[in-house]
Swiss-Prot record:
It comes from Saccharomyces cerevisiae (strain ATCC 204508 / S288c) (Baker's yeast). One of its GO terms (molecular function) is RNA polymerase II cis-regulatory region sequence-specific DNA binding. SUPFAM superfamilies: beta-beta-alpha zinc fingers. Residues 164-173 have a biased composition (Basic residues). The keyword Phosphoprotein applies. This is Probable transcription factor TDA9. Pfam families: zf-C2H2. A zinc finger (C2H2-type) spans 61-83, 89-112.
Length: 1251
């Protein structure tokens, strides 16, 4: 066998030649563990795993007892103490002895945190820290005792003996108490019987576990104590008593004696070690590498880090994030003062400034090695076993924007630990109305957690910002004559040519130009005193400070917010931006057409349709519920009718908000809006369990918000504006009244804020858009403060007993009684409520993750809820479980899916979606198939993962923006070399998981019906192509200008985006796929294009801009080619892509031409004649295809590219697509942007006739 073949084989050590030959002569032999009477050294055998050399690194320092080699001499010295049992470091407070200095520091900061000086925490000098710590440590060379006398414990009593003495002193048996030390000079302990029972003990006992009663060894026979089998067998700290090392000093020490330390009724295949021995052996054997593990600082051999270090800051921010589900073993009735030392780390009364905060929520290293239970939670683990480096891909803290400095201020916020914790949680559940009745506190109780004084850090600031933004649109103006008109609320000004100054988010001090309109304000119809209750807020110091720092410009009527924007006249002809009502009329005509269809569909009892859509009559009452529902694999709608509004509730809303009855929708209209919400919106974003809502005087902002969304789908945007104002005002007042109690914010309030955020993001009102950043920020803060992003089992015990199979396996009758309890109506009802509550919490977090990161992707505002902050589960795989209207239907579906709830763990698993989102992120980063080898993931979870990829794009863009702010080319190179491959890898991992779970990416005639019946597909596919588009181009600056209605900046930004041709070509491929997906889906839906979700509409708008930019580059190239023969020929990829876009646009024009209403012409859209352009509808597709598919580019092909003007045609088709789905007001803003861009292209292009 050659030498090459020997590579990688384990090398066996010749023991006989290395025991003495390799021993350094300078090493003196310390006493051996196995010393006998004749002082002959007994060499212990080398463990089997230690015989193999695992590294080529030289290890010159050898142990003369076991021949182990070490790289450093201090490692050898530490190892030798394992043989000699030397404990030279003494704790001055209690006398406990330790083998290492850092173990003493850990012990003191854990058990004597109140006695340790705080100077070491505040000091930055390492030498000063060491000097302070040395004051509390006594070093005694050669000591082998476990405990020595100290001033506080002069007799060197162990904790068990002290407990025994305290108990007998209480019972009046002081005379019989032996006051001798624990161990005499002959190293034998005195005969003291163990203490039994749960009696109270004095507060002087600080160290031992009150539940662990260690009997002392007999005076003559060195026996070992036994631990009860009910104690945890996974923690190495409970394997033996304090005098474990005495075994090594017995002449007849062998394996049988070592087994005596093992608790009875628990068997182990190998002898158990103490925590110190376990940690040392693991490190020395190479099983654990402390450098690669993300361990807490207290396990470091170099001592604790200073308080100013990053490790100390990181540890202080992670206080109380560990679940407290393992704390139910400590009850208030049987608690003793000794439990301060025996409680889990997260229950210790730790001061925040103390160095012992490193121990809070930090699992023991021994638990890490033994799969211990320090983590707690469901199944023993509620957080990752290790800090997986894959999650670093989503670490946003290093690249955060300045406005995100408050996003994590509540990471250390905790629940209040008081005696009324159960009642407060029940009250929160009642307020949320997620469940119909209070969950019985005897079955579901809250687990206690620690409270800190700084629970609401800087909460006043973000709350005041939200209140301040609420005043922006205080003067709500409605046109009474057009209150019930169909269409957007800003299409009826009497002076449509009025224009407003463009306002940027960074130039908010610029005054708006007020339009001269004759709108009548709602505030004019009520008294000044009544106006205060709806539109004014109580001023405080924080609000006054904000108002003084930044003046809020007064707002005009809603018509001015969406009016055409006026620009500076420098180098720009202002007439090209004077957009008339041609685009607005397109939307109004389409809305009236759709409303007429809805009249025939929803209510045959409607009166004259002409009166319903006229500008002077009121909309008739709607009396019939929506009858059509759509069902599919991911969507199931119940037939139960939802009636949230009654006359009593409507009168209450009118009275509390000081409105007039004729300026508020009727009960039938409000309930009709709820139906529209359920049919059109809820199936795309199901984060509210509608059947659990019980409207009341407190939570009616939620049903108002629901009807607000439905009003948009009913084309009554004026109603939606009024309802949003009422809901926003009531939410703001609720937050003001509960300023000091935000940790108990009800779920219905967060759900209302989510719906309000939807309307603010996708509104064409500048004032509403300005409040989005604050609304998302307050949502994120409330989620973190109320710990909504953590699993529910951390705070509420599942209302189900365990199966007791092991306990009653020999008693089938009792076991059957337990199993029968799982199928009772009461138990099923409790399980259903717990499931709905858990899923509602999870879905709120996922929807906030969705809308906040999409908003960040569009306008580049850093106010998002980040993926790594989502510590809870995922939406359930079987969506129908969340749509069930009652517990009976829910239980039937559980049976249909073969889901059995026979323990709290099974209920927790179902409620958390059978996974957690951190595991999903790990798969997204490394693509490890083991994580999801056989698991099923819901499409809602896959949608959240896709949004996390968008978040990763945002993180990478922000990082490059900070590093290469002024160097565009360097930033582009770094993106292509580092960031883009990482994003592409994540997309590949996501694609594999999506396809494996039945997802569809390739469209065909066979799978189009499946896509249309599953709402998740209609969200996922456009966002998938949008992520690929963003991988190529950074379009966020352009979209930010559009939302600010700054058309000049928009055009300038688009010129920069379309600068690099290769990236633009690839992005255009994905943009064409988005448009093709839309035309494929709507062409088979028979005109039901109103079901196009708003996220898809946004992706369509961005795709239109990209396609138009690419077509303009080709048209400019074709013109330059005709005039300059030196320019290279047009590539075949460009010709294929142009032809693909041409066919898609022709399909769109053909589809939209079938509408029953007359649309504006192409010339009307451009506002100027486009001389020389060709009508694509009259062109022969086969002729164009033959011309462009020729081997050489002819002048005829270039002329076709130039004269078809697909750049302008694309913008025109985009405006017609937006007009075909006129639900959200932002569609009108998008259409104005497309018209502006089309006019800009015409005015900045050479005339075709001049070519």
């Amino acid at each position: 066998m050659s030498s090459e073949e020997f590579k990688g084989l384990p090398i066996k050590r010749d023991i006989s030649s290395t025991i003495y030959a390799d021993r350094p002569p300078a090493l003196s032999a310390p006493p051996c563990v196995g010393a006998t009477g004749n002082d002959k050294i007994q060499v212990l055998p080398i463990p089997k795993k230690s015989r193999t050399i695992k590294t080529d690194k030289p290890r010159p320092f050898l142990c003369h007892i076991c021949t182990r080699g070490f790289v450093r001499q201090e490692h050898l010295k530490r190892h030798q103490r394992a043989h000699t049992n030397e404990k030279p470091f003494l704790c001055v407070f209690c006398g406990r002895c330790f083998a290492r200095r850092d173990l003493v520091l850990r012990h003191q900061h854990k058990l004597h945190s109140a006695l340790v000086s705080k100077e070491s925490i505040n000091s930055k000098d390492k030498t000063e820290i060491d000097a302070i710590n040395d004051k509390n440590i006594i070093q005694i060379q050669g000591n082998k005792q476990t405990i020595l006398p100290t001033p506080s414990n002069p007799l060197a009593k162990t904790a068990v003996q002290l407990k025994k003495a305290a108990k007998e002193k209480k019972n009046g048996k002081q005379g019989k108490l032996d006051l001798s030390p624990s161990y005499g000079a002959n190293n034998h302990s005195t005969d003291v019987s163990p203490s039994v029972g749960n009696s109270s003990t004095p507060a002087v006992i600080e160290e031992t576990d009150s539940s662990s009663h260690f009997p002392l060894p007999d005076t003559n026979i060195p026996t070992k104590s036994k631990r009860h089998a009910s104690f945890s067998a996974s923690s190495a700290f409970t394997y033996s008593s304090d005098n474990f090392q005495k075994l090594h000093q017995q002449a007849k020490s062998d394996f049988d004696e070592l087994q005596e330390s093992i608790p009875h009724q628990v068997g182990f295949s190998t002898p158990q070690l103490t925590a110190q021995q376990l940690i040392e052996n693991a490190i020395e054997s190479g099983v654990v590498d402390l450098e690669t593990l993300d361990l807490p600082p207290f396990l470091s051999l170099d001592g604790l880090p200073p308080a100013s270090s990053s490790a100390a800051v990181a540890a202080s921010e992670q206080i109380d994030i560990c679940p407290s589900s393992a704390t139910d073993t400590i009850s208030g009735a049987n608690s003793t003062p000794n439990q301060a030392a025996t409680a889990p780390p997260f229950q210790l009364p730790i001061a925040r400034e103390s160095s012992s905060l490193f121990l809070a929520n930090t699992p023991y290293l021994s638990d890490f090695l033994t799969m211990g239970s320090s983590y707690g939670g469901s199944g023993g683990f509620a957080k990752s076993i290790t800090a997986d480096p894959s999650l670093d891909y989503f670490n946003y803290k290093n690249h955060s924007h300045p406005d995100s400095r408050h996003n994590n201020s509540s990471s250390g916020i905790n629940y209040s630990n008081n005696k009324n914790n159960n009642e407060s949680i029940e009250k929160s559940q009642n307020n949320s109305n997620v469940i119909n009745e209070t969950i019985d506190h005897t079955d579901i109780h809250a687990h206690h957690a620690d409270a800190h004084d700084d629970s609401f850090i800087e909460s006043e600031e973000w709350l005041s910002k939200f209140i301040m933004d609420s005043q922006i649109d205080n003067d709500l103006k409605l046109n009474i004559n057009h209150f019930n008109d169909i269409g957007f609320n800003n299409l009826h000004p009497q002076n449509p040519t009025t224009h407003s100054e463009p306002r940027n988010m960074h130039n908010e001090n610029r005054d708006m130009h007020r339009s001269a309109s004759k709108f009548q304000s709602v505030s004019e119809n009520i008294s000044p005193r009544e106006q205060m209750s709806l539109f004014k807020t109580k001023q405080n110091k924080a609000i006054s400070k904000f108002l003084s720092d930044e003046k809020i410009p007064s707002t005009a009527s809603p018509s001015s917010s969406a009016s055409p924007v006026q620009f500076d006249k420098k180098n720009v002809d202002i007439n090209e931006f004077l957009l008339d009502e041609s685009v607005s009329n397109l939307f109004t005509t389409r809305q009236i057409d759709l409303f007429k269809k809805n009249v025939n569909l929803y209510s045959p009892l409607f009166q004259n349709q002409k009166d319903a859509v006229s500008s002077t009559s009121l909309t008739p009452s709607l009396t019939t519920q929506t009858a059509t529902t759509q069902s599919g694999p991911g969507w199931t709608d119940s037939s139960q009718k939802l009636t949230f509004f009654t006359e009593q509730l409507r009168n209450l809303i009118i009275k509390e908000n000081n409105l007039k009855s004729n300026l508020f929708p009727t009960v039938d209209e409000l309930n009709h809006y709820v139906d529209l919400y359920q049919v059109e919106f809820h199936k795309y974003f199901p984060f509210i369990h509608l059947y659990s809502i019980i409207p009341s005087s407190e939570n009616y902002p939620l049903v108002i918000s629901i009807s607000m969304i439905g009003a948009l789908y009913g084309f009554h945007s004026t109603h939606a504006l009024l309802l949003s104002k009422i809901a926003r005002t009531r939410v703001r007042m609720f937050l003001e009244n509960t300023r000091s109690n935000h940790d108990k914010t009800p779920i219905w309030l967060m759900q209302s804020l989510v719906l309000l955020t939807f309307t603010s993001i996708f509104s064409n009102d500048m004032n509403a858009f300005r409040t989005v950043n604050t609304q998302i920020m307050i949502l994120v803060q409330l989620i973190k403060i109320s710990k909504l992003n953590y699993p529910l089992e951390n705070f509420i015990k599942p209302p189900i007993e365990s199966d007791h199979v092991l306990e009653y396996q020999d008693n089938p009758a009792v076991l059957n009684q337990f199993k029968a309890q799982y199928n009772t109506r009461e138990q099923i009802n409790r399980n259903f409520k717990y499931f709905i509550l858990a899923q509602s919490r999870i879905r709120i977090c996922h929807i906030v993750l969705l809308i906040s990161n999409l908003f960040k992707s569009l306008v580049d505002f850093d106010c998002c809820f980040h993926s790594i902050d989502l510590k809870c589960g995922v939406p359930c795989y079987n969506e129908v479980l969340f749509f069930c209207e009652n517990s009976r239907t829910w239980n039937e579906n559980l049976t249909r899916f073969n889901i059995v709830l026979d323990s709290k763990f099974s209920l927790i698993e179902v409620s958390n979606g059978e996974s957690n989102y951190e595991k999903c992120l790990m798969y997204l980063s490394n693509g490890n198939p083991y994580l999801y080898k056989n698991a099923k993931i819901s499409f809602k979870t896959l949608l959240s993962l896709l949004i996390s990829i968008h978040e990763k794009i945002n993180i990478e863009r922000d990082a490059l923006k900070d590093s290469y702010e002024s160097d565009f080319h360097a930033k582009n190179v770094q993106w292509r070399m580092h960031s883009r491959p990482l994003v592409a890898t994540m997309l590949k991992h996501w694609e594999l998981l999506y396809i494996k779970n039945g997802g569809i990416l390739a469209l065909s005639d066979e799978n189009l019906p499946i896509i249309n019946t599953n709402p998740s597909f209609r969200l996922i596919i456009p966002l998938y192509f949008f992520a690929k588009l963003r991988k190529c181009l950074d379009i966020a600056p352009t979209l930010r200008c559009i939302w600010n209605q700054d058309w000049n900046s928009m055009n300038s930004s688009l010129e920069k985006v379309c600068y690099e041709r290769e990236s633009l070509r690839e992005a255009t491929e994905y943009a064409v796929s988005v448009i093709t997906f839309w035309i494929d889906t709507v062409s088979v839906m028979k005109g039901k294009s109103t079901q196009t979700p708003i996220f898809t509409i946004t992706c369509i708008f961005v795709s239109i801009l990209v396609i138009a930019g690419y077509m303009r580059r080709l048209e400019d190239f074709a013109q330059n080619k005709n005039s300059d023969c030196m320019i290279g020929s047009l590539k075949s990829t460009d010709r294929i892509l142009w032809l693909k876009a041409f066919k898609t646009l022709k399909r769109i024009e053909s589809h939209l031409s079938e509408r029953e209403y007359k649309l504006q012409t192409f010339a009307e859209f451009l506002r100027v004649p486009d001389n020389g352009s060709l009508d694509i509808e009259s062109l022969d597709s086969s002729l164009i295809e033959n011309t462009l598919n020729s081997h050489d580019v002819t002048n005829q092909a270039l002329d076709i590219i130039t004269r078809t003007r697909l750049s302008s045609r694309t913008l025109y088709c985009g405006a017609r697509i937006l007009g075909d789905t006129p639900v959200w007001p932002v569609s009108l803003l998008f259409a104005h942007a497309l018209q502006s861009r089309a006019i800009y292209n015409i005015n900045h292009r050479k005339s075709v006739n001049s070519v």
